[in-house]
Amino acid sequence: MVQRWLYSTNAKDIAVLYFMLAIFSGMAGTAMSLIIRLELAAPGSQYLHGNSQLFNVLVVGHAVLMIFFLVMPALIGGFGNYLLPLMIGATDTAFPRINNIAFWVLPMGLVCLVTSTLVESGAGTGWTVYPPLSSIQAHSGPSVDLAIFALHLTSISSLLGAINFIVTTLNMRTNGMTMHKLPLFVWSIFITAFLLLLSLPVLSAGITMLLLDRNFNTSFFEVSGGGDPILYEHLFWFFGQTVATIIMLMMYNDMHFSKCWKLLKKWITNIMSTLFKALFVKMFMSYNNQQDKMMNNTMLKKDNIKRSSETTRKMLNNSMNKKFNQWLAGLIDGDGYFGIVSKKYVSLEITVALEDEMALKEIQNKFGGSIKLRSGVKAIRYRLTNKTGMIKLINAVNGNIRNTKRLVQFNKVCILLGIDFIYPIKLTKDNSWFVGFFDADGTINYSFKNNHPQLTISVTNKYLQDVQEYKNILGGNIYFDKSQNGYYKWSIQSKDMVLNFINDYIKMNPSRTTKMNKLYLSKEFYNLKELKAYNKSSDSMQYKAWLNFENKWKNK
């Protein structure tokens, strides 16, 4: 039985195998479609808990499954192999063994596609795999490479099938069946095969160039290396236009031949118009670049004259960047790690709570890198391995890193990259390092002591010198906690110290995580505490206000 189906080169057997693969892929694609529709059925996050990367992976998987593993295998591979030899009076296709290979590369492509969703955080690039979202900076793992391999394998299958159908139609017609007597279904398969033969090498070239950009440091689509991301769009949609025509031809193959010819003319018109539009855009851009150069030369003398608003804006941007760099250094000191792989590759990892994803997104927007969920824990990890991004980040935080362990790691990274190491600057009260370290290792909680609620803001660390600055500049107390192998804990509990910390420091240096929400609720906590609203015996409205506060605190 295995040999009967797996080794068969009979066109009808292979058609049945195509249908089986298409049905399986269609069911998987339908399941993904259902999840996508359920997620979009109402505003806000429904089932994926705000995991936008997972949603993007589902979109990619759904599109590739439906187009490359359902529509094309079923309409061309299935119906074509079963009906085309019958309609032209042939016993089989021209190349039966090529037919067998054309099918069996598809399951391998399906394995690559499924594997791509299970590696790293998945290929969340959109089904067109456009750079720069598909570049190594945005998706550093092998997930996108596996998705591209899946596209390569489907392209090989379609190319082999197209060659087979073209040769079969031209050379294996029965006596007396001339081309103008062919059924329209055979014509649609024949034209489709030609379109695939012309367009698939272009798609394969585009995704191969993308693979080279990702893995061999070329810059076909990398702007910083002189590449052009729009080139990929042109290459992909040279194939994409063909896919639309293929689907129309296959779905409406029973229409009159004149209508088929109109569709073909429309496709040719679309291709030509696309090419001419691209040429026109490039000519227009070239003309504009010349005009810009002339304008820049004219304005050179005026460049040094800055209006007061421009000067103010530049100073404000510099101040904001300085605050961000100080905050980032504090976050790295608390939850970060500088690593060196094989004595030559540097990397940075930062792990935060799942609800603080937006803080990592802000870092990613500035320096690149990737973000993925940590398995088994409610945490999310940011990872930066790109050398350009690492150099930019190290220059940003140089002089602000001060954690005992992190300083040693940071110094080694600076030596490897040839960057001068700057010793930590002296901390002042307006330095955002404190809030960055608080976002990483700090907590704000309240507990009941002798039936009275007590609010505590604290920061913990293994080394005394890393929390000593909090006491020196912001006040409070430090004590040694023997639990969890021992650590030092800085804390403030009195109302005056907590409110001073929020009003004098946090207002000027706001937290970039969800801790900021609880800090804002502190004033409400003290107002309700003065009213003794936490007592069940107190006024019912006050107790309801306390319950409402507790609910907001838990949700923050």
Swiss-Prot record:
Assembly mode: Homodimer.
GO cellular component: mitochondrion; respiratory chain complex IV
Name of the gene: AI4
Cofactor dependence: Mg(2+); Mn(2+)
Record flagged with keyword Protease: no
EC number: 3.1.-.-
Family that this chain belongs to: In the C-terminal section; belongs to the LAGLIDADG endonuclease family. In the N-terminal section; belongs to the heme-copper respiratory oxidase family.
Gene3D superfamilies, alphabetized: Cytochrome c oxidase-like, subunit I domain, Homing endonucleases
UniProt region (COX1 intron 4 encoded), positions on chain: 241-556
GO molecular function ontology, one term from the record: heme binding
Role description: Mitochondrial DNA endonuclease involved in intron homing. It introduces a specific double-strand break at the junction of the two exons a4-a5 of the COX1 gene and thus mediates the insertion of an intron, containing its own coding sequence (group I intron), into an intronless gene. Recognizes with limited specificity and cleaves the sequence 5'-TTTGGTCACCCTGAAGTA-3'.
Additional record remark: Residues 299 to 556 are sufficient for endonuclease and intron homing activity.
BP term (GO), one: mRNA processing
Consequence of substituting E362K: Confers mRNA maturase activity
Transmembrane segments: none
Organism: Saccharomyces cerevisiae (strain ATCC 204508 / S288c) (Baker's yeast)
PTM text: The mature protein may arise from proteolytic cleavage of an in-frame translation of COX1 exons 1 to 4 plus intron 4, containing the aI4 open reading frame. Cleavage would take place close to the Met-299 resulting in an active endonuclease of about 30 kDa.
UniProt name for this protein: Intron-encoded DNA endonuclease aI4
Keywords of this entry: Endonuclease, Hydrolase, Intron homing, Mitochondrion, mRNA processing, mRNA splicing, Nuclease
Pfam families: COX1 (PF00115), LAGLIDADG_1 (PF00961)
Keyword Hydrolase carried by entry: yes
